UniProtKB/Swiss-Prot annotation:
One of its GO terms (molecular function) is metal ion binding. Its cofactor is Mg(2+). CDD domains: DSRM_RNAse_III_family, RIBOc. Its EC number is 3.1.26.3. This is Ribonuclease 3. Disulfide bonds: none annotated. The keyword Lipid metabolism does not apply. InterPro entries: dsRBD_dom, RNase_III, RNase_III_dom, RNase_III_sf. The active site is at D53, E125. Homodimer. It comes from Roseiflexus sp. (strain RS-1). Belongs to the ribonuclease III family. It catalyses: Endonucleolytic cleavage to 5'-phosphomonoester. Keywords: Cytoplasm, Endonuclease, Hydrolase, Magnesium, Metal-binding, mRNA processing, Nuclease, RNA-binding, rRNA processing, rRNA-binding, tRNA processing.
Amino acid sequence: MRKSVDELSARLGVTFSDQRLLEQALTHSSFLNEHVEERMHLDSNERLEFLGDAIINFLAARLVFERFPDAGEGELTAWRTALIRTETLAGFAQRYNLGAYVLLARGEESSGARQRQALLADTFEAVIAALFLDQGLNAVRTFLLPLFEAELASLPDRTLPVDYKSRLQARIQAERRVTPRYHEIDRSGPEHRPEFTVEVRAGEERLGTGKGPSKQAAEQAAARAALDALEGGTDGR
């Protein structure tokens, strides 16, 4: 059962001037596919996801740029990745129980979509975009900064997260003048707990494969396998 938008506004600590933006942020495309008549009044949150993704990326980049003045580009990229990855954004969404407020089709509902990390992360991005359109960038920054700060503080001993994708890209571009490409080759498990399998290639050569609970995690695992193979002279499977 979906909970009320007014309740979510109170949970977020935000009063929207245009509550329709928040309604849109919580409208999954599957709901409109099932309830065609609602398209007269509602849009899906896909466009808001696009905008929210860009806003979150920018604010995360700005924070780590200011926080770590001596860090190089690779380190800054790794810190930013820790803040914007699917698992992190899904965790932010869970703090506010966002999944309980999303409009979903019955099929998505029965498959456990409200707990799916990808859906939670996408919804969080859409809510951020709605807040930006309603109140501007400063309001978004005020809302996001404590979440980002808590995430950075939670990293073990402030250890820099390893971004294997960035490491692999730098190496392959330097050695072969091409950019590694990632391809999803399998998805298994239940809808609410999927496992992705991804391979990474340089041109036609497969460098490695990896598995994970999200495409991002699987890509990182594939990049790590590729680096291990390149350094050890083995197949990256």
